[in-house]
Amino acid sequence: INVKPRGVRQFSNVEHRITVSALSEGGTRCFPDRKIGNAEFKATPDENGVLSFTYDFPLEGEYFIRIFNGDSRILQHNVFAVNEDLAGRIPRIGDLHLHSCRSDGRELPETVAANYRAFGYDFLALTDHHRYYPSLEAIYSYKDVDHALTMVPGEEVHMSRNFVHIISFGGKFSINALIKDTFPTQAEIDNLPRPGVTKEDVAKFALRAINESDCPEQMTHQEFYAKVEELAKTLDIPDCINNDVERFMYAACVWEFNKIREADGLAIFAHPYWISDMFQLSESFTDYMLKQHPFDAFEVLGGERYYEQNGFQTAKYYSTRSEGYDYPIVGSTDSHSSNSENAGAYVARTMVFPFENERKSLINAIKDKYTVAIDGILAEPRLVG
């Protein structure tokens, strides 16, 4: 470990005392004989003003490194020791569920991206209702800008006769656009040009895939219904999903999750405890979905500030975990305005531990459960996972 002051104030050229203490092992005043995770060193600055010592951290977790000159503590740093599973992974903060004015949000896609980068986000996907192209619009808007924000394609998937909200994060083609005569309409596309954005620009991002060659063939609504009904025959759907409407919805969810994976994306089951008159989904439907988990990740924290959504979803997550069901989780704002005066703009986020801040590495890390969902409703963040 090398410690070097960055300012003009340097270490005195005398011997310093350095202590290392593991946060998990209790205070040395109360437990003076507990040696594991606690150590003491003597060091004098070298010709470059650097204090150096060598320590083999015995435990995973947080450590305090404290430096003393005589009896005065002059510096404290926190460091983390990790096991091999976290070695090389860098924590990244982001959002997997956001809206712009292209559906029912307020700001342009590029404004949403800029606002979340200003807040410190490392990655995001714009996931407008029914629409894939706004996420490409956000990416295209910064094609000539050197920036550190990773933007991936995304959409909130709303297929006919399925009222469950599903997020496609990072998919290479649109799931919504697999059905003919769906959003966006030609009139919507025709209205996209504006000052600084030409028709030629629009043609490069108003697409239904990252590369148009990746687009699967479209189908009619009736063809979609037939595919879902055929899939439903192969699923062991229990009696608790007790009518044809719900049975179709569950089968449609499985079909959509499969299609998102076919698009090389991450399939997210979103906010079952969102209150839309009543809870969006019945308790039995939510229970079965979480226990079967045909999705890739559960949006355990979503965009509402009332307790019944995030509180109930968190309780449900820990309850099913205690029963032996395990699945990846994420947290997102589901924000419809990215301006800081919107109280819901930063209510939740996800910390992911990928090897790289890029689409596939983020997806793999989430699938492998290297995530923490962060509730930002209060000043003091609360963590889930």
Annotate the PLM regions.
Residues 85-266, 270, 300-312, 332-339:
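A metal-dependent hydrolase metal-coordination microenvironment
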Residues 272-274:
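Extracellular glycoside hydrolase catalytic/binding regions
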Residues 1-91, 161-173, 277-385:
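Charged catalytic cores and adjacent phosphate/nucleic-acid-binding surfaces used
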